[in-house]
């Protein structure tokens, strides 16, 4: 069999044969390449393996090895060339010597896969085509072609008069010109060129689908063109309108995968700026870069990101160039001919491998801006001293270790110097001569310990954040702005006093006092000196007549000085200090104060808002969370009639006087959570502008009158004592989120739920099942989740919580933050647990299965993950098999900026790594080595500050999905686990978060408290927090038979009988041991929508894997039996998200008990993943004395009941001795596979597993699934008529007499009834 170059066509019914699988297994260097055909109707930017428009004949499977070159595959396929597309983006031609399979293997290896066998398996997965794909022909997208060139044979008439006749001519619109041939369908004759820039395009009314093209100028020419169809007319009008509207002759051909300049573009001789960035331009070929000199008026040329490798020397012949960009092309040197570009003013060479510049560069006397950032320079090139007009030098991301100020002094005209992200450790001053021309300097992210720039007497702005500075010395003659945060500064010296200074940022340092010179700065408007060691605020600072914004939070300030005179202060942040009171004259003297944050202090009272009868306060935002305020402070708030935001959470409020709340008419957001309030005043109805009310964790028993407010949007009354809701006849249309969880006594009728049908998010508790019917839940952990949108209009944070996972003794918790997108967090929320469940059965090594879980989830994002990205955090608790002294181990993996913190013995233990450029120097260096461009706002290519994410595949190899992994055994000292997104940890320290929730009994209230604290401390973004309470005892046994006394030969079959029981040969659909080699792949799998795998169940396992029984985990007290049993393992998951529009719509219309589908979406806690007990697949018939034997077993405490899995909400119990033949008729036992839905999702057929699908039958909302109580309609209850009562009692009596003896009570029964959730 010939494998290299052989072709196998895959269609929706053909399969990956056993012969091919056997051949692949023989050597890991063998594999297959999916070869796609070109389809001009399919967009290259959105193509994927899920593209339904690609016919089966366009997809071929080529078996090859890592040594097979592209030329050999082309020969076998009858192709001229192969093309490679990465991440649905650009398409480049492969060189004949390149090896496609090796390219795939290298790609997977760089993503994070290490095992060669796993790399071979992943390479055969058709879903990979969303990230890397091969074409036999170059694909073209029609709208791309339209923007490059429009052509066709149309009826044309020259001139505005009707003297000329209509004639068919070849018409081309390319670049800035309209080209009309003199002969029909011929380009060899004379071509008439009509420049369109500055001209006009008009509709010809007398002729249908006709346009009049006119050039600019006094002697303008006009051509009338008649099109055959409306679509052609619109295409030409749209493209021509862009050309005529330009002021300059600019042509943008970026991101078109071009290898050469279109031939007709050379007719546009008036082009002044040509953009060819992000293409694959060739040097020597017709239309290549060597022909660009034909544009005689070209002034600007952008050739960045073309992977040229060598500098195009012929570009130096274009003497008219004033702007040239050649960034990210892999240059290692520049030719001497570059000195010919005498008119060049701007030269960008960023992202290459340059180590030196030629001396001829000094000839460019007109050069004003030079960009050589992210190269390999170790010193400032001397040739720059010859550039007398040079104004800006950008050398960020190089390898400079020493900064010689003398070299900068010799550059007489340089004003802006960018040296951030180098390796600077020392600054050398050659002489005392001052430098009078440098005004802006950026030294961020270096390794400086001391910095003396006093010789730069004209310095206006300095950035030196994130160094290791202990002392900073500057000249104050011209200083206007200073940014020196995130250092170790103990002294900042500026002389003379900076009279022009307007902004000063010194946060995150070790300063013990405000510098004296700062107190004397007469124009200082902004001062941020938070996160230092201050003990006081100087009177001169607080009484400054120029200061408008003062940030002194997170210090040790005990008291603020009293104000004597009026001050212009507008923003005051004094949070996290030790203040017991505020100055009495604060509000009366600071009449411009609009924002005050005094949270996390020890305030017991507030100063009066006015000295006289009338208040002049303009205060709008007031944050007083976590103080010692009582009811006595409420009357003072009335003096601030313009308050819009008021936070009084976590104080000691017991009442809120109705008369006082009535006067806060401008109030828009009110947070009263964490107090001791029993009611919200009825006068809240007068706050007509109120849109947010947060009052969780109080003692409120009466629902406030907030549903009459016209603008109310968000209401959080969770963790209170509500018993009922009084709602008006009509609810406000603006209401989006109503949280009533944690109100254990609250019962909502169906009529009430119907009235909330329009609410995006209705959060209520699920009605608990009776104690005798409830399933066995974990006593080792419980969780609470809170998510708040903040000031943004959508929630881009989702969470995953499974208290019972896999075998029922594990748990999985996750947090996903999409920053600005909400799609990816929801996809990860729905898929990642399934991927983990599959991966833990492939490997027991935590590093391996966690890494593979993230990488596979990255792949499953499909097209959605090409341009979007998300931070991800996953925590997996499982039995610890490696450490016999520990019951459970915790494995945490993360990418991005979501973090997990473990509270151990009252102290925080961080388990995550922050993958950002600012916090991880190693990752920043990796990104720099890959020659990425890091913009001044510290973002990779201006997109994200994270270096590792799930998604954002188009930023490969700079952004990777490989996670950081940490494992630790859980001990009795581990109290809780906190998961939070970026916004949470930006505003709360690890220690404060742990201390805030350690003594909160309810995990839901704890999570809510963390989010409230973050918002009160200044967070305006989405914030998400999950708190997992741990109860890991030393006596905890984690084996599968813990707490279960095995029944004797009556309760279950005997051991001998079990040995004879045949093992199941049908694999479980949830066992997760899926392989591309052991399972059959069809084209339907290849063509399935990768982006719609949000609810995919685990793949069908191979036959070989299914025959291997999984050994049961037992301890020495509960030895394993000699016979294995089989059971499908669902899980119990609680999903929380902000929208259910994630591809999970179900085809099943069967109603489910306990789920209210009244038009609004509700959150439902469902069992879909974990098993809580085991059951034999079959057992022999019971002996005749089975009833007596069962009674004896119950007397010994070994009795138990099995709850039907397909009646999880009804709580029906089946006795263990029920006839098995009846059970086998259940769909949940007779079918082990899932049901294929129309969207490609796989769901099992059990009712309990369809709960999540039924929940999504509700109209699509923005906030996911929420817990709804299970309530029976009154008419559904069983009612016995009076005339039949006696007859029914007699029948029940006879039925009881026919039953076995009841179980003994009291001391005879020592153990409670055990109950297990099984697949039955």
Swiss-Prot record:
Q: Which PROSITE patterns match?
A: LRR, PPM_2
Residues modified to Phosphoserine: 1207
Record field: compositional bias (Basic and acidic residues): 1289-1312
Q: Which Pfam families match?
A: LRR_14 (PF23598), LRR_8 (PF13855), PP2C (PF00481), RA_3 (PF23010)
Phosphoprotein recorded as keyword: yes
Entry's SMART domains? Answer: LRR_BAC, LRR_TYP, PP2Cc
Ways its activity is controlled: Inhibited by AKT1, AKT2 and AKT3. Activated by oleic acid and arachidonic acid.
Needed cofactors, names only, are: Mn(2+)
Q: What is its EC number?
A: 3.1.3.16
Tissue specificity, please?
Expressed in the retina.
Complex formation:
Interacts with AKT1, AKT3 and PRKCB. Interacts with STK4, RPS6KB1, RAF1. Interacts with FKBP5; FKBP5 acts as a scaffold for PHLPP2 and Akt. Interacts with NHERF1; NHERF1 scaffolds a heterotrimeric complex with PTEN.
Its recorded name reads: PH domain leucine-rich repeat-containing protein phosphatase 2
